[in-house]
Regions:
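Low-complexity "stalk/linker" and mucin-like segments enriched in Ser/Thr/Pro/Ala/Gly
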Residues: 53-66
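Extracellular receptor-binding modules and their adjoining Ser/Thr/Gly/Asp/Asn-rich linkers
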Residues: 1-39, 67-70, 75-95
Length: 95
């Protein structure tokens, strides 16, 4: 995916990571950080879970807060606590 004004090719980085969210209480949002070598705060990051999340869990953001860290903000929009399973997520990072 190219953004307007960019003439480059594909992603600077791409791969998969395992994301295992903690138990999330109802209506709460948590950060889940994973290490991605070479990821920079200047990268625009796109992620996609490779299997269905539990009903009520939503990834509301993914970004690089510090070099080498990919942060997932995962919200529980349900009225019950959810302990989500570890899942494989694909990522692409663009300059």
């Amino acid at each position: 995916m190219l953004l307007e004004g960019e003439g480059g090719g594909g992603p600077a980085l791409q791969g998969t990571v395992s994301v295992n969210p903690p138990a999330i209480t109802k209506y709460e949002t948590v950060n889940v950080d994973v290490t991605v070598s070479g990821l920079l705060t200047s990268h625009r990051v796109f992620v996609q879970c490779q299997s269905d999340l539990e009903n009520g869990l939503v990834c509301v953001a993914a970004y690089c807060p510090v070099n080498g860290t990919l942060r997932f903000r995962i919200s529980n929009w349900s009225s019950n606590g959810i302990d989500g399973a570890a899942r494989t997520w694909a990522y692409q990072a663009y300059v």
